[in-house]
Amino acid sequence: LTGDDIARMARQPKLCPQFHLSLQSGCDATLTRMRRHYDTAEYMRIVQALRAHFENCALTTDVMVGFPGETDAEFKRSLSFVESLGLAKAHVFAYSRSPGTRAADMTGQLPEAVKEARSARMIEATNRTRAAFLAGQAGRTANVLF
């Protein structure tokens, strides 16, 4: 999404200000291993542009934990980045090995217990940001479709 794309969307009066931007990880090293074509700075630029054009917009995402090679430091970086986003909701899931994929053959496969613990921590964090987002909706008036 470019700034022009976002400005064009903002001119549409019937557009619901809810945006799902798949993140996958809040750590650039992990995103590189995943072969994603963006980094956290670009992601944050899009988030800031959306918030500048859409007051009180709802941002949602997908976050994967436990991707092969993810260190404790990388997980903490991802957790911190996700917390900084103030998301309305996040779908958190642990990496699961799928035969035939590039990631399945990567070194650094993490034990299930580590992936489960990281998933639980990320879910706790995103539940807090969701609660804060929802609390901010109290008393607001919004147009809805039925």
Identify the residue ranges that each predicted region occupies.
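Conserved non-cysteine loop/helix-boundary elements of the Radical SAM core domain that shape
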Residues: L1-A88, Y95-V114
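Terminal RNA-binding accessory module
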Residues: D105-F146
